Regions:
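Conserved P-loop NTPase motor module
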Residues: 2-15, 135, 167, 190, ...
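Glycine-rich phosphate-binding loop of nucleotide-binding enzymes
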Residues: 12-80, 224, 228, 244-248, ...
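Conserved P-loop NTPase motor cores
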Residues: 32, 36-45, 181-277
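The start of beta-strands in P-loop NTPase/AAA+ ATPase cores
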Residues: 61, 173, 214-215
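Active-site flanking residues adjacent to catalytic metal/cofactor-binding acidic residues
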Residues: 65, 177, 218-219
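Active-site regions of enzymes building and remodeling cell-envelope glycoconjugates
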Residues: 73-84, 258-263, 272-281, 287-291
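Helical/strand "switch-coupling" subdomains that flank nucleotide/phosphate-binding cores, especially
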Residues: 75-163, 171-174
């Protein structure tokens, strides 16, 4: 009965006061949504379960990048999404594609040179621009061939999509992008980066917002946080447009991510820099232990 009462109180809590995530020594513990959120903890410590509760209690429309098919909502197979990459700035497109394919910095710059004057609307157009790009040295010939091979390896997955990704952003419900059907790790990373960049563009066109108006939940976030500065840029800049990114990860993110985030630790681990005996909310350099509800 007590558990039911706590859940009812948590659900009724006003968004302005934050979302209830647990009970501490001084009562209910609320997670503010004026910053991004990191949910971290070892495997099978309840990270996904907590993320689902925060989504529900916030009442905000949410887009979930679901790596393993664990979230509920309006589900959409990632293979059905259509990305209009022509709407991306060419430098951003080169970075997103390059990081998704795990290219090094010289290869990303080469990719940018190949596409900067080309008309691009699909990944197939990116491959064609590369193929048409004139090179002068043996090293450039080899670099060009290597990039095309990697791109063709994953491009066909993104050529069959029929549902514009913008339709996902316009729903007022929880939209779950199911990445579990994608076979390759690179496909999942690239799809995640495309969604993040597309959502950033979508919200930027709507203008600055002083209040949170949408959630982006990134499951297995450690897989994209390792992909370079452009991910951090999109992460940092998105907050001013009302987007709150919730990173669900079993690794403690880098310090520059933590500075912009509240951290909920579902279970302590010796590799984490924060010291706590149980689950905890870390904000403003203070660790508040709690029992998650």
């Amino acid at each position: 009965m007590w558990d039911v009462f706590l859940l009812l109180v948590a659900t009724m809590a006003a968004l302005d006061d934050g979302v209830v995530v647990g009970v501490g020594p001084r009562g209910l513990v609320r997670l503010p949504l004026d910053r991004h959120v990191v949910i971290t903890g070892p495997t099978r410590s309840g990270k996904t379960r907590l993320a689902k509760r925060i989504i529900k209690r916030s009442g905000l429309p949410a887009v979930v990048l679901d790596w393993h098919g664990e979230y509920s909502g309006v589900r959409l197979d990632a293979r059905l999404l259509k990305f209009d990459v022509g709407k991306f700035d060419k430098k951003l497109l080169a970075e997103v594609v390059g990081l998704g394919l795990n290219l090094n910095e010289p290869s990303i710059y080469f990719l940018y040179r190949a596409i900067k004057s080309a008309k691009i609307s699909t990944l197939g157009d990116v491959a064609k621009a590369l193929d048409d790009f004139l090179v002068a040295t043996r090293s450039e010939v080899e670099m060009k061939a290597a990039i095309i091979r990697r791109l063709e390896y994953v491009a066909d997955v993104f050529e069959r999509g029929k549902v514009p990704v913008e339709a996902v952003f316009k729903t007022r419900r929880v939209a779950v992008v199911d990445l579990s059907k994608l076979r390759l790790y690179e496909e999942k990373v690239l799809a995640s980066l495309f969604v993040l960049a597309s959502l950033y563009n979508h919200l930027a066109n709507r203008g600055v917002s002083k209040r949170p108006n949408a959630l982006l939940v990134v499951d297995e976030a450690q897989n994209i946080l390792k992909r370079g500065d452009v991910v951090r840029y999109l992460f940092f800049e998105s907050a001013k447009y009302g987007l709150r990114v919730m990173l669900v990860t079993n690794e403690m993110p880098p310090g520059d991510i933590l500075v912009h985030s509240y951290v909920v630790m579902t279970r302590p681990h010796f590799t984490y820099t924060f010291s706590a005996k149980r689950s905890a909310l870390i904000r403003d350099n203070k660790v508040e232990e709690l029992w998650i509800i």
